[in-house]
Each structure stands twice: as structure tokens, then as C-alpha cells.
Amino acid sequence: MAGLSKAKQKLLIVGNGMAAGRFLDELIKRDISGFEVTVIGDERQGSYNRIMLSPVLAGETDVPAIIGKPSSWYRDRGIRFVSGVQVKAIEREQKCVLTSEGNRLRYDHLVLAVGSRPAKIPAENQQLDNIYSFRTLRDVDRLLNKARFHEMHGRKTDTDALVIGGGLLGLEAAYGLALKGLRVTLVHRSGWLLNRQLDPTAGGYLKRALEAKNIDFILSDEVSRFTGTHELKGAEFKSGRELSCKLCVIATGITPNKELGLAAGLKGERGVAVNAFMATSDESISALGECVEFKGDTFGLVEPIWQQCITLAERLCHNIKLPFENNPVPTKLKVSGVNLFSAGEYLTTDEHRELIYQDDKAGIYRKLLLRDNRIVGAVLIGDARDGQDYFSMLTEKKDVAEIAPFLLMGRAFYQTNEQPQSSDETEAA
């Protein structure tokens, strides 16, 4: 009948982390008038910038500054926000989800953005008090409270805080605690830091830079057992080493929250499997963020997740198929005074032409890896000013044969020595 408006589609988003928050932004940029949007999140507050937890711990910013979406944000945009609630099951035949409160919420289209959880380590007695993960605002709040009272009772220990994990998150957590005046020791099972982004030489430069910021390191070792009755007293290592400590932060990576989707019969192994348009094996369910698996890969950095949000928003709002591509992403470290950049391949092989500049006194190490006159990897520490230029050359597969001798000297040198295209070549093109 004329005059009747088309019924809105019920769009239900499970999860309210960074992926869900960015996806909402992308929806609103387009047109959500055809949707009745509901967001369910297990944390009480709205979406916040999780990658800024390290600066909050370090005291370089505060909690209000990283809350991107307070409750009023959802209300003002006509979005229903159900906070502090978990989804326990997906009932695909009925097209509804069952919540931890026993309620059922219907959907026409479901988006899973349930993120990930901290990876576990094979150590005994992890139930002791003062052993934390570093994943949520609650984690940071507990660490800050502990840091404020780290000298309680005058207890003497080898270190105030033990951080497990030499990846980006572990290094940033260690730095934040050190800024609070705690004596920090970081343990990493590899022989060098950031071993998935840096070569051993760069890892050594990074270690020295962080030691200057009052962080100690134990490398090529693992915690096998925590000691204490109720509260943490110390840690025992596989090597036989023992260390007394007051608190521990475990930051050894993430595990995708795939269980909700897989229990409902969705396909996946490492995560909930999606295609290039973020669709799962059920046409009524999509997924994005750290919970997904795409061509065998999972995701922990924001850049590819932002692209996933664009891809899904285009498909749902405009029925435009803009395929997601898992492109290279550079690594940067959020530690004040430590300039680090890594992209692409980082371990030299016989296939590479290696360009290296080192200045031990200044703490500068710059390495480029070339294959067939194209940059395939860049590792910079101490001076990362040209990182984005190198990354652009890498992604564009630019032929750098003419400027290779000048690449490590900096932009002014390699741009000056780059040969302009001749007029004959231009006309021929």
C-alpha cells in the first residue's frame, strides 16, 4: 500500500571493541536509515581506543581521552546499546542470539566483532593475586592501583614488576610501569626482542634503548611456575633461575574469540572464517576484527581491521563488493624516545641484497632488504624518519636500482639522485 515505509532491517552487532566502534563509524558515514542497529558489549563503557591503553598506563594520557563512544553517542544516533552483557549462543534457525541475562534478541543480519583474549602461557599457579593481563581498561586500572602502592609494607624483592612477552604489547606495558617508578624485568622466550619484526641486531639496539629507560631483560627463558600462597611472591624459570616480584603482567599475544561462532556451526579453524567481503559460511552472519580468519591469517593490528570495516559497510549499506586485501602493515612502537619502524621481510637470506647503516654510539640501525631491485623489507631503529617512504616503495614495488646507493642516506639524497623520466620515454608511454 502507498504510504507504508519499508520495514527496517535488524542489524545486530555482537562486540563493542575497536572493530565494532570503527564499523559503526563507517555505517554512519553512509546511510543507516534502513537499519535498526543494536550493539551488545560485555564491558560497561562504550567503545574505546584499546591501542591507547599503554599511554594511559604510562600517564601520557587519561581514560576519558580514549573513550571514543560514551553511552550518549549511541543514544544520539538512534543506536541501541546493551552494555555489560555477553552473548552465550547464536540460534541460527531462529535468527536470534541468547544473552547472559536469558534474553533473546532477533536479527536480520548479525555481525560478530567479539575480538580476542590474551594468550595463555604454560606456567603453574596463574590463579595467584597480582597476575594480570593487559587487555582492557579494567586491567590498566588494576595495574595503576598496584603501581601507586608498590612500596607497601617495605617489602624487598628482586623486581617490582615482571612482564612476560617481548612483543609490542609487553614492551609498552614494561615502559608504562617503569615510568611509574617500578623496577621492571621483562622476560622473553626468544633470543631478541620483537623477534617477529626485527632481526637480532635491531633487537639488540632496542634492548639497549629500553635498558636506558630502567627496564631489565631476561631473554631465551620462560616462566614455568609462579610462587606464593595467595599473592604472587615470585617466579621460577625453565633455566632454574628464580626471581621475587610483586606483580606480573602477561602480554604474550592474543587468541581469537572464535568459540561463539564455531559453536553455532560457522566454519573456521584459527578464527571465524570469512571471505573477502567479510561474510561467514552463513549468509546472514558477517564477522570482522580479531575474531576472524581470512585465508588462514588472523589479525591484531588496526590497519587491516579498518579496511575490513569499510568492506563490510559498503556491502551492507550499498551492496557494493569492495574486497578486503591483507596488505603489509608496518610496525611502530609507542615508547617515548624510541624510534622504531619495521615493514615486510626482516631476516636476511641469500635471495636479498642487503643495505645497512649502523651507528652504535648514536643507537642508529637502518637496514633495507632488496630483491630484484625492489624493497621487500625495512628495519629502522634510532632514526625512522624515512620509514613511510620506504614502505610506499615496498607496497608500490618501485624499481630502486638507480637510487639504491643513496637510499640509506635519507630522502634528500635519494630524491636528488632519482633520475627523472625522459621526454622520449614519456612520449612513448
How should each PLM-predicted stretch be described?
Residues 15-18, 135, 164-167:
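Glycine-rich Rossmann-fold phosphate-binding loop(s) that bind the pyrophosphate
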Residues 2-10, 29, 291-388:
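Mid-to-C-terminal Rossmann-like scaffold of FAD/NAD(P)H-dependent oxidoreductases
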Residues 14, 105-115, 243-253, 309, ...:
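Short hydrophobic core segments
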Residues 142-198:
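Rossmann-like NAD(P)H-binding beta-loop-alpha module
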Residues 36, 81-98, 105, 179-274:
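A Rossmann-like FAD-binding core segment of flavoenzymes
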Residues 2-80, 176-197:
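Beta1-alpha1 glycine-rich phosphate/pyrophosphate-binding loop at the start
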Residues 127-152, 157, 230-236, 241-314, ...:
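FAD-site-proximal beta/loop scaffold in flavoenzymes
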Residues 361-423:
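C-terminal auxiliary extensions adjacent to catalytic cores
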